Amino acid sequence: MKTLLLTLVVVTIVCLDLGYTLKCNKLIPIASKTCPAGKNLCYKMFMMSDLTIPVKRGCIDVCPKNSHLVKYVCCNTDRCN
């Protein structure tokens, strides 16, 4: 009976597909945050005048287009930014 119950619990967890939560770095890379639902990308924003130091990091739903002043780099794995 215990085996049957354990099997049902495992099957339920697998079938529910509990979902995956993405973690993105904040501005300071040692700190990260869990992205809210619908925000499936991590991003880094750079000023075009200095592409070596990101000025903003976080979660986003759609990667913005680059402009003459700002460059965005987006990715979709944990802490990839």
Swiss-Prot record:
On tissue specificity, the annotation reads: Expressed by the venom gland.
The beginning of the lineage is: Eukaryota, Metazoa, Chordata, Craniata, Vertebrata
> Is Signal tagged as a keyword?
yes
Q: Does the keyword Membrane apply?
A: yes
Alphabetized Gene3D superfamilies for the sequence = CD59 (2.10.60.10)
Query: What's an example Gene Ontology biological process for this entry?
Result: killing of cells of another organism
Q: Where in the cell is it found?
A: Secreted; Target cell membrane
Q: What is this protein for, i.e. what is its function?
A: Shows cytolytic activity on many different cells by forming pore in lipid membranes. In vivo, increases heart rate or kills the animal by cardiac arrest. In addition, it binds to heparin with high affinity, interacts with Kv channel-interacting protein 1 (KCNIP1) in a calcium-independent manner, and binds to integrin alpha-V/beta-3 (ITGAV/ITGB3) with moderate affinity.
What keywords appear on the UniProt entry? Cardiotoxin, Cytolysis, Disulfide bond, Membrane, Secreted, Signal, Target cell membrane, Target membrane, Toxin
Question: Listed disulfide bonds for this chain?
Answer: 24-42, 35-59, 63-74, 75-80
Species of the source: Naja atra (Chinese cobra)
Kindly report the protein's main subcellular placement as a broad class.
Answer: secreted
Family assignment from sequence similarity: Belongs to the three-finger toxin family. Short-chain subfamily. Type IA cytotoxin sub-subfamily.
Q: Which GO terms describe its molecular function?
A: toxin activity
Q: What InterPro entries would the database entry show?
A: Cytotoxin_Cobra, Snake_3FTx, Snake_toxin-like_sf, Snake_toxin_con_site, Toxin_cobra-type
User: Signal sequence: where?
Assistant: 1-21
Instruction: Read off the CDD domains from this record.
Output: TFP_snake_toxin
Q: How does it assemble?
A: Monomer in solution; Homodimer and oligomer in the presence of negatively charged lipids forming a pore with a size ranging between 20 and 30 Angstroms.
Q: Which GO terms describe its cellular component?
A: extracellular region; membrane; other organism cell membrane
Q: Under what name is this protein listed?
A: Cytotoxin 1c
